[in-house]
Amino acid sequence: MALAYDGAIQRLIDAFGRLPGIGPKGAQRIAFYMLSAPEDEARDLAEAIEEVKAKIRFCDICGNVCESSPCPVCADPRRDRSVICVVEEPKDVMSIERTREYRGLYHVLGGAINPMANVGPADLRIPSLLKRLEGDEVKEVIMALDPNIEGEATTSYLTQLLRPVGVKVTRLASGLPVGSDLEYADEITLGRALAGRREA
């Protein structure tokens, strides 16, 4: 039987351990840091978590995170409404925004097709994307999904689905490492991939 800490400290370690990218040792380090941190720092963290759960929602139009819907991008009249960039997660929107190369709109799918994790097309925000393409305002859809197996499968699926709609479907140019996440791409590489996009 594995040894565990007593009560509240083990509960905190377990809670941190459920966060993505944090293993058991990292969770233990964070928990013990919080134990020795000033009380106001621990309170600030707890309040920030409660506040984000209470205030943050998903944009009714694009699926990005926001405090009120529509999000600032969808509400901005200066954005190019003829182009929609499709991404997996809200964090990908920020990665592309940091490049300062893109002035269109976004559509956040909420993931990618992944049969191993039981995520299929029905689990993604695909119907709302199709609804946004019903008019003739959108001329191009940019597939900016992670360059991994799941992202490629989702790009392929969406390209086939969108072909009959009559919009131009493009994808980011090469330059992003295969198997990586957009979140970790530097602004210059991502900006060049966006500027050099090609037909899907």
Curated annotation (Swiss-Prot):
Superkingdom, taxonomy of origin: Bacteria
Keyword tRNA-binding appears in the UniProt entry: no
ZnF endpoints (C4-type): 59-74
Keywords: DNA damage, DNA recombination, DNA repair, Metal-binding, Zinc, Zinc-finger
CDD domains: TOPRIM_recR
Database matches in InterPro entries: DNA_Rcmb_RecR, Rcmb_RecR, Rcmb_RecR_Znf, TOPRIM_dom, TOPRIM_RecR
Any one GO BP annotation for this protein: DNA recombination
General function of this protein: May play a role in DNA repair. It seems to be involved in an RecBC-independent recombinational process of DNA repair. It may act with RecF and RecO.
PANTHER family, sorted: RECOMBINATION PROTEIN RECR (PTHR30446:SF0)
Record-given protein name: Recombination protein RecR
Record gene name: recR
